[in-house]
From Swiss-Prot:
The gene is sseL. It comes from Salmonella typhimurium (strain LT2 / SGSC1412 / ATCC 700720). Effector proteins function to alter host cell physiology and promote bacterial survival in host tissues. This protease targets the host cell ubiquitin pathway by acting as a deubiquitinase in infected host cells. Specifically hydrolyzes mono- and polyubiquitin substrates in vitro with a preference for 'Lys-63'-linked ubiquitin chains, suggesting that it interferes with a signaling pathway rather than inhibiting proteasomal-dependent degradation of its targets. Does not possess desumoylating activity. Belongs to the peptidase C79 family. Induction: Expression of the gene is induced inside phagocytic cells and is dependent on the SsrA/SsrB system. Highly expressed in host macrophages and when grown in an acidic environment. This is Deubiquitinase SseL. Keywords: Host cytoplasm, Hydrolase, Protease, Secreted, Thiol protease, Virulence. The keyword Transmembrane helix does not apply. Disulfide bonds: none annotated. Its EC number is 3.4.22.-.
Length: 340
């Protein structure tokens, strides 16, 4: 028995027995985590079972597995596939006639990281849609262009909705006091033709004033871009980060007019950084908005324009495979905020 447990799970008998008590030893968890990072399938299966626990330990293990699955934590090259396949097996067990009403399987019947990972591994479209319904519930598009249909949840070319982008970026802001991020908006109201960015700026200034780094996420119709107001040498600057084709002049002018409300006096003080980064990240504009907020929150006193331009230039030097991996992992990291 001792040899079997040690060879399967890298644990001693006492450490293995501790997994079935309320308090699992940190030593046993550390050994399991290390084995899972290296792709040990037996340990992955064991941790996925532990992640079913609806207590602090279960949530900690579930988070660890999702961090590996989403690329936040480094593991073996195929770690995401091993984890989501293990979750899929658990999901199949959770839905058989014996266990489907068992509360111990709750995480596989309600929105959770485990259910999301199981859904990503499902190839049966009807089952995939069924899982997506459990995760998303009923969602409504904020604009005509938003794709909120459940069949698109794991699609690598799905446009992020306002709610997803808001959940993820607000989650980032909680981790960094350097940025203020506003709820995503459309630039122009579809019926009244009102400049919504201007309205949001006026409301923000009236309520609390602009912070030193104020972010607005703006949809121009079918595309997200990042609008940042910041101070440099005591002067207010405006930076537009656009990861697709250059904006048309009408759109640029609407942004410039809104920027004047924030104190921008000259149009040349609105800096448009425009590079097409989306060849291998289809409909990835929202992903880049999220990622650039991450960059800005860690940039300290560095000039935001320099930070974002360097990122864009470096991204274009990545291989097709590296850009595709960015697409997959960033989508997973973003959706995690909607599961919390």
């Amino acid at each position: 028995m001792n040899i079997c447990v040690n060879s399967l799970y890298r644990l001693s008998i006492p450490q293995f027995h501790s997994l079935y008590t309320e308090e699992v030893s940190d030593e046993a968890l550390t050994l399991l985590f290390s084995a899972v990072e290296n792709g040990d399938q037996n340990c992955i299966d064991l941790l996925c079972n532990l992640a079913l626990r609806n207590d602090d330990l279960g949530h900690r293990v579930e988070k660890f597995l999702f961090d590996l699955f989403s690329g936040k934590r480094t593991g073996s090259s195929d770690i995401d596939k091993k984890i989501n396949q293990a979750c899929l097996v658990l999901h199949q067990i959770a839905n058989n006639d014996i266990t489907k009403d068992n509360t111990e399987w709750k995480k596989l019947h309600a929105p959770s990281r485990l259910l999301y990972m199981a859904g990503s591994a499902t190839t049966d479209l009807s089952k995939k849609i069924g899982i997506a319904h459990k995760i998303m519930g009923d969602q409504f598009a904020q604009t005509d262009q938003e794709q909120v249909g459940v069949e698109n949840l794991w699609c690598g070319a799905r446009m992020l909705s306002s709610d997803e982008l808001a959940a993820a970026t607000q989650g980032l802001v909680q981790e960094s006091p350097l940025l203020s991020v506003n709820y995503p908006i459309g630039l122009i109201h579809p019926t009244t033709k009102e400049n919504i960015l201007s309205t949001q700026l006026l409301e923000k200034i009236a309520q609390s004033g602009l912070s030193h780094n104020e972010v607005f996420l703006v949809n121009t119709g079918d595309h997200w871009l990042l609008c940042l107001f910041y101070k440099l040498a005591e002067k207010i600057k405006c930076l537009i980060f656009n990861t697709y084709y250059d904006l048309n002049e009408n759109t640029k002018q609407e942004i410039i007019e809104a920027a004047k409300i924030a104190g921008i006096s000259e149009s040349d003080e609105v800096n448009f950084i425009e590079m097409n980064l989306q060849n291998n990240v289809p409909n990835g504009c929202g992903l880049f908005c999220y990622h650039t907020i991450q960059l800005l929150s860690n940039a300290g006193q560095n000039d935001p324009a320099t930070t974002l331009r360097e990122f864009a230039e470096n991204f274009l030097t990545l291989s097709v495979e590296e850009q595709a991996l960015f697409n997959t992992q960033t989508r997973r990291q973003i959706y995690e905020y909607s599961l919390q």
